[in-house]
């Protein structure tokens, strides 16, 4: 049992040692990698594609720019950014999990996306890039899995160019109480069953539901981004606040 609360963190509803969380999260994503895209469509009824499209639209990414798609997984955002930045630009798809990174690389190469995409296994808390490297950073449904979110946000701030922007797309807190109750019922009762049927892994999708509940709400995450140095931070609620897109700038 860990007694020092400064050395513990949350893994879903469990309290675990900080040094254990990364390995526990890694096991979740090793387990779900092969069925990740299928489960995304099933879990969100395909709406995740609209959330990601809105993120792309809010990114302001242009031809020739350099983008970091952090926790990029199977590369949905990277595919879009690759076309936007063109041959003169670059997209780095980074993920801490090698199984997810492998799935992303194979998926993008199979649809002909090569040349301006680089793949890097990286921890968001200690990004292996020089200061002032990227015009835009996105992290999509990944921040809640990070052990030290404040450290990760500071790391993202460091590698952004002045004038660059960070976009955090993440599950958040529904703004309507009836929706909140229905969402809880879906997340804790239906979602694990779907995970068991499709991915043969109810436990990983139970963790998903729990990790969403433990993630900071909209205003708390906004304050965390401000504390990390970002300015003009705002957010957009989507699907009643089930998901929120936060955007902040480095000036």
UniProtKB/Swiss-Prot annotation:
Residues annotated as transmembrane: none
UniProt pathway annotation: Quinol/quinone metabolism; menaquinone biosynthesis; menaquinol from 1,4-dihydroxy-2-naphthoate: step 2/2; Cofactor biosynthesis; ubiquinone biosynthesis
Lineage: superkingdom: Bacteria
Catalyzed reactions per annotation: a 2-demethylmenaquinol + S-adenosyl-L-methionine = a menaquinol + S-adenosyl-L-homocysteine + H(+); a 2-methoxy-6-(all-trans-polyprenyl)benzene-1,4-diol + S-adenosyl-L-methionine = a 5-methoxy-2-methyl-3-(all-trans-polyprenyl)benzene-1,4-diol + S-adenosyl-L-homocysteine + H(+)
One term of GO molecular function: demethylmenaquinone methyltransferase activity
NCBIfam families: MenG_MenH_UbiE (TIGR01934), PRK00216.1-1 (NF001240), PRK00216.1-3 (NF001242), PRK00216.1-5 (NF001244)
Biological function: Methyltransferase required for the conversion of demethylmenaquinol (DMKH2) to menaquinol (MKH2) and the conversion of 2-polyprenyl-6-methoxy-1,4-benzoquinol (DDMQH2) to 2-polyprenyl-3-methyl-6-methoxy-1,4-benzoquinol (DMQH2).
Protein name per the record: Ubiquinone/menaquinone biosynthesis C-methyltransferase UbiE
Organism: Cronobacter sakazakii (strain ATCC BAA-894) (Enterobacter sakazakii)
């Amino acid at each position: 049992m860990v007694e020092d609360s400064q050395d513990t963190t949350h893994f879903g509803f469990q309290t675990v040692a900080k040094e254990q969380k990364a390995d526990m999260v890694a096991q979740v994503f090793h387990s779900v990698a092969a069925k990740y895209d299928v489960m995304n469509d099933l879990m969100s009824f395909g709406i995740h594609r609209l959330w990601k499209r809105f993120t792309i639209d809010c990114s302001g990414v242009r031809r020739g720019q350099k983008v970091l798609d952090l926790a990029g997984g199977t590369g949905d955002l990277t595919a879009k950014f690759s076309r936007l930045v063109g041959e003169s630009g670059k997209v780095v798809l980074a993920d801490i999990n090698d199984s997810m990174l492998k799935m992303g690389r194979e998926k993008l190469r199979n649809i002909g996306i090569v040349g301006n995409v680089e793949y890097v296994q990286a921890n968001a808390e200690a990004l292996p890039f020089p200061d002032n490297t990227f015009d835009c950073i996105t992290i999509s449904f990944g921040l809640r899995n990070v052990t030290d979110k404040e450290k990760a946000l500071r790391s993202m701030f460091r590698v952004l160019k002045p004038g660059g922007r960070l976009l955090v797309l993440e599950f958040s807190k529904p703004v309507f109480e009836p929706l909140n109750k229905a969402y809880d019922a879906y997340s804790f009762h239906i979602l694990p069953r779907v995970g068991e049927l499709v991915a043969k892994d109810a436990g990983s999708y139970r963790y998903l539901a729990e990790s969403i509940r433990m993630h900071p709400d909209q205003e708390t995450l906004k304050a965390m981004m401000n504390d990390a140095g970002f300015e003009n931070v705002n957010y957009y609620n989507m699907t009643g606040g089930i998901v929120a897109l936060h955007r902040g700038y480095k000036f």
